[in-house]
Amino acid sequence: SLLAFGIKPQENVAVLGENRPEWLYCHLGIQAARGVTCGIYPTSAPEQIKYLLNHSEARLMFLENEEQLDKVLAVLGETRIERVVVWDAKGLWGFADPRVTFFGDFLKQGVTYAQTHPGAVEERRESVEPQDTAMIIYTSGTTGPPKGAMLSHASILWTTQALMAVNPGRSDDEVVSYLPFAHIYENLISVFQ
Protein backbone atom coordinates (compact mmCIF):
# COMPACT_ATOMS: atom_id res chain seq x y z
CA SER A 1 0.00 0.00 0.00
CA LEU A 2 2.86 2.38 0.81
CA LEU A 3 4.54 1.60 -2.49
CA ALA A 4 1.23 2.00 -4.32
CA PHE A 5 0.98 5.49 -2.81
CA GLY A 6 4.50 6.23 -4.05
CA ILE A 7 6.53 6.33 -0.85
CA LYS A 8 10.19 6.79 -1.73
CA PRO A 9 13.13 5.40 0.25
CA GLN A 10 13.77 7.50 3.37
CA GLU A 11 10.53 9.46 2.95
CA ASN A 12 8.85 10.54 6.19
CA VAL A 13 5.38 9.22 7.02
CA ALA A 14 3.39 10.60 9.97
CA VAL A 15 1.47 8.37 12.40
CA LEU A 16 -0.98 9.86 14.93
CA GLY A 17 -2.99 7.83 17.41
CA GLU A 18 -3.23 5.91 20.64
CA ASN A 19 -1.39 2.60 20.98
CA ARG A 20 -3.22 -0.02 18.96
CA PRO A 21 -2.30 -2.76 16.48
CA GLU A 22 -2.77 -0.49 13.45
CA TRP A 23 -0.07 1.85 14.79
CA LEU A 24 2.37 -1.06 14.75
CA TYR A 25 1.24 -2.30 11.33
CA CYS A 26 1.93 1.15 9.89
CA HIS A 27 5.17 1.61 11.82
CA LEU A 28 6.69 -1.68 10.71
CA GLY A 29 5.27 -1.35 7.19
CA ILE A 30 6.82 2.09 6.82
CA GLN A 31 10.19 0.73 7.90
CA ALA A 32 9.88 -2.30 5.60
CA ALA A 33 9.19 0.14 2.72
CA ARG A 34 12.43 1.91 3.72
CA GLY A 35 10.42 4.89 4.91
CA VAL A 36 10.76 6.83 8.15
CA THR A 37 8.10 6.73 10.88
CA CYS A 38 7.32 10.13 12.39
CA GLY A 39 5.11 9.52 15.42
CA ILE A 40 2.84 12.28 16.69
CA TYR A 41 1.45 12.22 20.22
CA PRO A 42 -2.35 11.77 20.28
CA THR A 43 -2.61 14.61 22.81
CA SER A 44 -1.16 17.10 20.30
CA ALA A 45 -3.21 20.19 19.45
CA PRO A 46 -3.86 21.11 15.79
CA GLU A 47 -1.09 23.74 15.74
CA GLN A 48 1.41 21.23 17.13
CA ILE A 49 0.34 18.69 14.52
CA LYS A 50 0.77 21.30 11.78
CA TYR A 51 4.28 22.09 13.01
CA LEU A 52 5.30 18.41 13.05
CA LEU A 53 3.76 17.68 9.65
CA ASN A 54 5.56 20.64 8.12
CA HIS A 55 8.85 19.87 9.85
CA SER A 56 8.75 16.25 8.69
CA GLU A 57 7.56 17.21 5.20
CA ALA A 58 5.31 14.13 5.23
CA ARG A 59 2.96 13.60 2.27
CA LEU A 60 1.17 10.66 3.88
CA MET A 61 -0.20 10.23 7.37
CA PHE A 62 -2.06 7.56 9.27
CA LEU A 63 -4.35 8.48 12.13
CA GLU A 64 -6.68 6.81 14.56
CA ASN A 65 -10.19 8.19 14.44
CA GLU A 66 -12.63 11.06 14.06
CA GLU A 67 -11.09 12.98 16.99
CA GLN A 68 -7.63 13.00 15.40
CA LEU A 69 -9.04 13.60 11.91
CA ASP A 70 -10.86 16.73 13.11
CA LYS A 71 -7.58 18.13 14.43
CA VAL A 72 -5.75 17.33 11.20
CA LEU A 73 -8.48 18.70 8.93
CA ALA A 74 -8.24 22.03 10.78
CA VAL A 75 -4.65 22.46 9.51
CA LEU A 76 -4.41 20.11 6.51
CA GLY A 77 -4.40 22.89 3.93
CA GLU A 78 -1.30 24.37 5.55
CA THR A 79 0.74 21.15 5.16
CA ARG A 80 2.18 18.96 2.39
CA ILE A 81 -0.10 16.05 3.31
CA GLU A 82 -1.65 14.50 0.20
CA ARG A 83 -3.37 11.53 1.81
CA VAL A 84 -4.76 10.84 5.28
CA VAL A 85 -5.51 7.21 6.14
CA VAL A 86 -7.95 6.68 9.03
CA TRP A 87 -7.90 3.41 10.99
CA ASP A 88 -11.25 3.66 12.78
CA ALA A 89 -14.18 4.83 10.66
CA LYS A 90 -16.62 4.95 13.58
CA GLY A 91 -18.52 8.24 13.43
CA LEU A 92 -17.31 8.89 9.89
CA TRP A 93 -19.86 6.95 7.85
CA GLY A 94 -20.82 9.06 4.88
CA PHE A 95 -17.79 11.29 5.35
CA ALA A 96 -16.18 12.15 2.02
CA ASP A 97 -12.99 14.07 1.34
CA PRO A 98 -10.70 13.20 -1.59
CA ARG A 99 -7.65 13.52 0.68
CA VAL A 100 -8.98 10.99 3.21
CA THR A 101 -9.27 7.23 2.87
CA PHE A 102 -9.92 4.43 5.32
CA PHE A 103 -7.37 1.82 6.33
CA GLY A 104 -9.14 -1.14 4.70
CA ASP A 105 -9.35 0.68 1.37
CA PHE A 106 -5.70 1.68 1.62
CA LEU A 107 -4.70 -1.96 2.20
CA LYS A 108 -6.71 -3.06 -0.86
CA GLN A 109 -4.63 -0.68 -2.99
CA GLY A 110 -1.56 -2.52 -1.71
CA VAL A 111 -2.96 -5.91 -2.72
CA THR A 112 -3.56 -4.63 -6.24
CA TYR A 113 -0.08 -3.10 -6.37
CA ALA A 114 1.57 -6.34 -5.22
CA GLN A 115 -0.28 -8.26 -7.94
CA THR A 116 0.79 -5.87 -10.69
CA HIS A 117 4.35 -5.36 -9.37
CA PRO A 118 5.53 -8.83 -8.28
CA GLY A 119 8.61 -8.73 -6.07
CA ALA A 120 8.56 -4.94 -5.57
CA VAL A 121 7.69 -5.14 -1.87
CA GLU A 122 10.42 -7.69 -1.15
CA GLU A 123 12.95 -5.72 -3.19
CA ARG A 124 12.23 -2.54 -1.24
CA ARG A 125 12.40 -4.33 2.11
CA GLU A 126 15.72 -5.94 1.21
CA SER A 127 17.16 -2.53 0.25
CA VAL A 128 16.95 -1.21 3.84
CA GLU A 129 20.41 -0.24 5.13
CA PRO A 130 21.52 -0.23 8.81
CA GLN A 131 22.37 3.49 8.66
CA ASP A 132 19.00 4.44 7.12
CA THR A 133 16.84 6.59 9.35
CA ALA A 134 14.12 4.36 10.82
CA MET A 135 12.26 6.89 12.96
CA ILE A 136 12.15 10.54 13.83
CA ILE A 137 11.25 10.94 17.50
CA TYR A 138 10.10 14.42 18.42
CA THR A 139 10.89 15.97 21.78
CA SER A 140 8.07 17.36 23.88
CA GLY A 141 9.01 20.91 22.98
CA THR A 142 9.06 22.23 26.55
CA THR A 143 11.91 24.66 25.82
CA GLY A 144 10.82 25.68 22.32
CA PRO A 145 9.56 23.94 19.20
CA PRO A 146 9.92 20.13 19.23
CA LYS A 147 13.17 18.81 17.86
CA GLY A 148 13.30 15.70 15.71
CA ALA A 149 15.85 13.06 16.71
CA MET A 150 16.72 10.93 13.69
CA LEU A 151 17.31 7.32 14.75
CA SER A 152 18.88 4.76 12.44
CA HIS A 153 18.02 1.07 12.32
CA ALA A 154 21.54 0.36 13.62
CA SER A 155 21.18 2.67 16.62
CA ILE A 156 17.77 1.23 17.52
CA LEU A 157 19.14 -2.32 17.28
CA TRP A 158 22.20 -1.44 19.39
CA THR A 159 20.09 0.24 22.08
CA THR A 160 17.61 -2.64 22.15
CA GLN A 161 20.43 -5.17 22.53
CA ALA A 162 22.00 -3.08 25.32
CA LEU A 163 18.67 -2.92 27.18
CA MET A 164 18.18 -6.66 26.80
CA ALA A 165 21.69 -7.30 28.14
CA VAL A 166 20.83 -5.61 31.45
CA ASN A 167 17.16 -6.65 31.53
CA PRO A 168 16.73 -9.86 29.56
CA GLY A 169 13.15 -10.73 28.77
CA ARG A 170 11.57 -14.15 29.04
CA SER A 171 9.08 -15.72 26.68
CA ASP A 172 6.35 -15.60 29.37
CA ASP A 173 6.86 -11.90 30.20
CA GLU A 174 3.89 -9.60 29.72
CA VAL A 175 4.46 -5.97 28.83
CA VAL A 176 2.12 -3.10 29.64
CA SER A 177 2.18 -0.55 26.86
CA TYR A 178 1.78 2.69 28.80
CA LEU A 179 3.75 5.30 26.83
CA PRO A 180 2.61 6.40 23.37
CA PHE A 181 4.30 4.68 20.42
CA ALA A 182 5.52 8.15 19.41
CA HIS A 183 7.91 7.83 22.39
CA ILE A 184 11.22 6.02 21.85
CA TYR A 185 11.16 4.13 25.15
CA GLU A 186 7.81 2.51 24.34
CA ASN A 187 9.28 1.33 21.05
CA LEU A 188 12.34 -0.08 22.76
CA ILE A 189 10.41 -2.06 25.38
CA SER A 190 7.24 -2.99 23.47
CA VAL A 191 8.10 -3.09 19.79
CA PHE A 192 11.75 -3.92 19.24
CA GLN A 193 12.48 -6.34 22.12
Predicted regions and their residues:
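Conserved structural elements of the adenylate-forming
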Residues: 130, 149-170, 175-178, 188
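Conserved helix-loop-beta element of the AMP-binding
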Residues: 59, 77-87, 175-176
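Conserved AMP-binding/adenylate-forming
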Residues: 1-47
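Conserved G/P- and acidic residue-centered "switch" motifs that form tight phosphate/ATP-binding loops
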Residues: 34, 141-142
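Conserved pre-ATP/AMP-binding loop-to-beta segment of ANL
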Residues: 101-104, 111-138, 145, 168-174
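Conserved short alpha-helical elements in the N-terminal third of ANL/AMP-binding
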Residues: 29-35, 186-193
